[in-house]
C-alpha cells in the first residue's frame, strides 16, 4: 500500500496501544491471505475504484499520481481489466471473510464506499477519469442494495468530481453547526442480553465529540432495519456507529476520520495520541479488538 498524506486513526491507536498487527492490501486480500486472520480493521479506503474521489482537488499531486500507477499495476498483475474490478474482488473477499466468521471494523469512507462497491457489482459507476471508460447509463437502476451490509435506497453520486459517493453521508449537516456543539451519543445495552454491543460501547462517557471525515456519519433514512445503531445524533437524523451480523461473522462501521482532529485535511500531521490518553472517540476503536 502506498503511504497516503493523511493519518490513519486505526493504525495510530493500535501502535499507541502496542497491539501487534499486520498490514495487508489488495494483492494480499485477492491472494486469500485474510483466511489467516480473525480481525480486519480498515480506515479511509475507497472500494469503488474512484481513488477516494480526490480527482478535482488533488489529481495533479505526486501522491495521487502514484496511487493511480500503483493501483493500475496491481490490477494488471492480478489479472483484472481495471482497478474498479480489482477493488470489487477485494470487497467480495472481505465479505466472504466476514461470512466465514471474521470480524470487520471499518471507518470513514471505508464504510459507505464498501457497501456501494458490493451493491454496484453488476454495473459501472466509475467515469472516464477513473477507469478510462464511461459509466453505464442508468447505473442507479442496477444498484443491488441487498449485497451491502448496512444501507439501502440511497442515490449514487453521478458527478465524478464531487467529493462524495452517495447521499448516505451526513457531512453537510455538520457544516451548519459549531464544532463545540457537534456530538454523538452512545446507546446503552444490557450486558445480560446484548453482550457484544455492550462491549463495543464501553466508555467513560456516553456523549462523544463529533469529528468530520469524507464519510462523517450515516443518514438514518438509508440504514437497513436489521442494522444495530450504537451511536447517533437524533437531532441531525444521523448515526455514527453501526453494527451487524453476516453469516458467521460480524461487522462494525464507524463514521469520521480522526476522533481527536475535528477536520483532518490532506497533508495534516498525524495526531499525537500521547496528548489524548483518555480519548472516548479512540476508545471505540480499541473496543473493536
Predicted segments, located by residue:
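Generic recognition of flexible, low-complexity loop/linker segments
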Residues: 27-30, 92-94, 130, 216-217, ...
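Helical hinge/lid and interdomain linker segments adjacent to catalytic or ligand-binding clefts
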Residues: 3-111, 117-120
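Flexible glycine/proline-enriched surface loops and loop-helix/loop-strand junctions
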Residues: 75, 98-99, 138, 264-272
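Short loop/turn segments at secondary-structure transitions that flank enzyme active sites
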Residues: 43-48, 110, 120, 124, ...
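Short secondary-structure boundary/capping segments
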Residues: 56-57, 119-125, 268-271
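An acidic, glycine-rich "communication" segment
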Residues: 107-227
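Extracellular ligand-binding/catalytic regions of CAZymes and related secreted enzymes
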Residues: 220-289
